[in-house]
Amino acid sequence: MFDPTKLSECDVAEFIPHRDPMILISQLLEYSQDSLLTQTDLSTASPYFDPRLNGVPNYVGIEYMAQSIAALAGVEAHLRNDIIRVGFLLGSRKLKMHISQFKLGQSYQTKVTRLYQEESGLAVFDCQILHNQEVVAEANVNVFQPQDTQAYIADAAQ
């Protein structure tokens, strides 16, 4: 049986639909109802690492937020004994990047908190990326998770 108090021992890939090399978050740290804290550890092997910046460009932070939201959905799916579903990043509001890059050798925590969710799968999350307890990026992120991804994609293609 899944124990959310032992998230830090779990493989991130068990909770999100992404696969390497596109898994950007390193660890799930803490779950509470409607909220998840994750960690991203930066190395030269990190996706989007730019040696000219000696880090990852700040705009990748929106994907750290989106993958943390996906991981929250994955934790909730595990708690329901449900499958991991694909979701879609629709956009963001109030996006503020307080740093120009995520630096090599540093760890960043991403906290996502659900503000609103409709039965249709549309949701809004408050997201913050922290470094040493300081907010370095923040946004309200809009996402959509259809109940049947294949049917949704087929309908959208018509």
Language model regions located:
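Short aromatic-glycine motifs in intrinsically disordered, low-complexity regions
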Residues: 9-19
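Small-residue-enriched segments and motifs
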Residues: 23-26, 90, 110-112, 139
